[in-house]
A protein has these predicted regions:
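Short, solvent-exposed coil/turn elements at secondary-structure transition points
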Residues: 20, 31, 78-80
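Short, glycine- and charge-enriched coil/turn segments that flank and shape catalytic ligand pockets
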Residues: 20-22, 42-43, 66-69
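Short amphipathic alpha-helix with an adjacent loop that forms part of the alpha/beta core around
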Residues: 34-42
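Gly/Thr-rich phosphate-binding beta-strand-loop-beta motif of the actin/hexokinase/Hsp70
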Residues: 1-23
Length: 85
């Protein structure tokens, strides 16, 4: 199982999936990121996180996720300007 997390400025969205299916998904206010939102019976193999809400939110979430004992990969969103002249 993979846990995919998108930390936005207002909402944080997450999805629990494998290579074929989505098993669970939800969202919560990013200001509540310090609460326990991630409790699963399934073994998590990897966590992938995209974050635009700043280092503090990332650090809090990192602490909350350490109990999964799996790799955590942070991907950096890229601004795209292809459609602007």
């Amino acid at each position: 199982m993979f846990l995919l997390i998108d930390i936005g400025n207002t909402k944080t969205k997450w999805m629990l999936r494998d290579n074929r299916s989505i098993y669970e998904h939800d969202s919560f206010l990013t200001e509540d990121i310090d609460q326990d939102h991630f409790k699963f019976d399934e073994k998590i193999r990897k966590i992938v996180i995209s974050n635009v809400a700043g280092f503090e939110k990332e650090a809090i979430l990192k602490i909350k996720l350490k109990n999964f004992s799996c790799p955590i990969e942070f991907i950096k969103p890229q601004k795209m300007y292809k459609h602007f002249l």
